[in-house]
Amino acid sequence: MPANLTEGSFHANQTVPMLDSSPVACTEIVTFTEALEAEEWGSFYSSFKTEQLITLWVLFVFTIVGNSVVLFSTWRRKRKSRMTFFVTQLAITDSFTGLINILTDIIWRFTGDFMAPDLVCRIVRYLQVVLLYASTYVLVSLSIDRYHAIVYPMKFLQGAEKQAKVLIGIAWSLSFLFSIPTLIIFGKRTLSNGEVQCWALWPDDSYWTPYMTIVAFLVYFIPLTIISVIYGLVIRTIWIKSKAHETVISNCSDGELCCSYNRGLISKAKIKAIKYSIVIILAFICCWSPYFLFDMLDNFNLLPDTKERFYASVIIQNLPALNSAINPLIYCIFSGSLCSPCKVQRSQDSRMTYRERSERHEMQILSKPEFI
């Protein structure tokens, strides 16, 4: 049985629970009666379970290996920075997602029933939801950090390291706080079809829809709105500063004035950090948007109970797990030192002045996302 975080109670018509790797999931796919009466549905469901296991194993390996490489890469850096800190936090969150969400889902599919005590059920569900919130709120913290770095660069330099730790501390604190209801809602339970599962213990099925709506807004819609507004302001600031730079350069005849103004421009390192952050956010949106939209439609019974819905749901439910496997790849693309050999150009260094070598060395360091 999968490690669904939002599996609801069985309805009157009895439903076959869905197989998914995500910590939150739609509560049903096809009715239990349909699964018994239609042989093709039953065989399809069983065969796809094997394919799902293969998919989950692949995602698990890529998630653990990829994020381990990222953590090792950030750990071996002698020079740390705010961006190193946030990349590390994101990799830690993704690693725990692989261990607690994906791996437990794989184990559940092998065992069928939930074998552990009720306390273990509640703790596992709680940790799964904590990671669900944390994966989103860490991205919000990263967005706020990038906003201050671009919009208020002078203020940002004062206590930047402390501010980054405070943002991450708030993100994890809110994640643990908002997940507390899970300890009450979920528990070990015998379902109507005889299975013993770690399931939602609702007094009535009508509680499920408002609960899932609240979770969807706290985990996805509200954070996505905040992130979108923040990066909108960041892009606007970059555009305004670039236009001001063009105006000054076109009207400037004094070299010293131009040089002093250039120092106030946004560095290439910060621009690259923004690009890295935006790609991470876009990956999050691509992986989670189909899931939450499908889940909301399903909880309000707006989707038809058809085989096409079954096909779509099985694919969509694996997308959140895919996000944790993609993030290390994005880091690899933006960090040349991780994925390509370092080329030291000694001959060029010998022809450069001390100032040119210093500036190039600084840009080589700052151009990597972990040092921005």
Swiss-Prot record:
InterPro entries assigned: GPCR_Rhodpsn, GPCR_Rhodpsn_7TM, NPS_rcpt, Vasoprsn_rcpt
Annotated signal sequence range: none
UniProt subcellular location: Cell membrane
Keyword match Cell cycle: no
Intervals, Extracellular compartment: 1-52, 104-122, 187-213, 298-313
GO biological-process terms attached to the record: eating behavior; negative regulation of defecation; negative regulation of eating behavior; neuropeptide signaling pathway; positive regulation of ERK1 and ERK2 cascade; positive regulation of release of sequestered calcium ion into cytosol; righting reflex
GO molecular function terms listed in the Swiss-Prot or TrEMBL record: neuropeptide receptor activity; vasopressin receptor activity
Domain of life from the UniProt record: Eukaryota
Keywords: Cell membrane, Disulfide bond, G-protein coupled receptor, Glycoprotein, Membrane, Receptor, Transducer, Transmembrane, Transmembrane helix
Membrane topology: Multi-pass membrane protein
Gene3D superfamilies named among the record's database cross-references: Rhodopsin 7-helix transmembrane proteins (1.20.1070.10)
Known glycosylation sites: 4, 13
Transmembrane segment boundaries: 53-73, 83-103, 123-143, 166-186, 214-234, 277-297, 314-334
Disulfide feature: 121-198
Cytoplasmic topological domain residue ranges: 74-82, 144-165, 235-276, 335-372
Family annotation (SUPFAM superfamilies): Family A G protein-coupled receptor-like
Gene Ontology cellular-component terms listed: cytoplasm; plasma membrane
Family: Belongs to the G-protein coupled receptor 1 family. Vasopressin/oxytocin receptor subfamily.
Entries under PANTHER family matching the protein: NEUROPEPTIDE S RECEPTOR
Function summary: G-protein coupled receptor for neuropeptide S (NPS). Promotes mobilization of intracellular Ca(2+) stores. Inhibits cell growth in response to NPS binding. Involved in pathogenesis of asthma and other IgE-mediated diseases.
Protein name per UniProt: Neuropeptide S receptor
Source species: Rattus norvegicus (Rat)
Upper classification of the organism: Eukaryota, Metazoa, Chordata, Craniata, Vertebrata
